[in-house]
């Protein structure tokens, strides 16, 4: 039986959803038996607030670009349909899941309940005392990432799928 997994990443307006920060991009890439299938989900979102300057420096998604994008509630069903019951593979899962579950709550939806593999926690177990951010893992495992000048959720999921 084929095993379906989804590599998932978000970009956000800041680092803490409890301070009102929101998701501004979702990227997800499908794996079947640990191989990229080509199926993906990407959505930019209007957070109805500005990004913190540090977050903007990381992702480069401006208010002007995001203002015409849908809100999370408008795309929640399509996002959940793409995920299905697949295991989620996320680098620093508590961060992304905190934001996504908050967005789902605001949209009147149940939180994500899929199995989750946190690749950051896994990397810390495998490489204690070393840097384990995505760029460091790319260098360690010889995964090409020179085209990654800014963080983008879909780009980061594609890179993480290669690392995984």
Stretch-by-stretch model annotation:
Residues 152-164:
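Acidic, divalent-metal-coordinating active-site segment for phosphoryl/phosphodiester hydrolysis
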Residues 117-120:
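Short, conserved phosphate-binding/catalytic loop or strand-edge motifs used
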Residues 1-114, 124-128, 132, 136-150:
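Conserved non-catalytic scaffold segment of RNase H-like nuclease domains
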């Amino acid at each position: 039986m084929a095993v379906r997994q989804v590599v998932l990443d978000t970009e956000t307006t800041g680092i803490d959803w409890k301070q009102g920060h929101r998701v501004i991009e979702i990227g997800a890439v499908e794996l079947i038996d640990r191989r990229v299938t080509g199926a993906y989900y990407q959505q930019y979102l209007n957070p109805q607030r500005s990004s913190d300057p540090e977050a903007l420096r990381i992702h480069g998604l401006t208010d002007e670009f995001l203002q015409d994008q849908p809100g999370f509630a408008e795309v929640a069903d399509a996002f959940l349909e793409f995920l299905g019951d697949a295991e989620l593979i996320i680098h620093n899962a508590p961060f992304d899941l905190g934001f996504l579950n908050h967005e789902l709550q605001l949209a009147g939806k149940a939180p994500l309940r899929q199995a989750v593999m946190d690749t950051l926690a896994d990397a810390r177990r495998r490489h204690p005392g070393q840097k384990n951010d995505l760029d460091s893992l790319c260098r360690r495992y010889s995964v090409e990432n020179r085209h990654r000048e800014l963080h983008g959720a879909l780009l980061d999921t594609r890179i993480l799928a290669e690392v995984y």
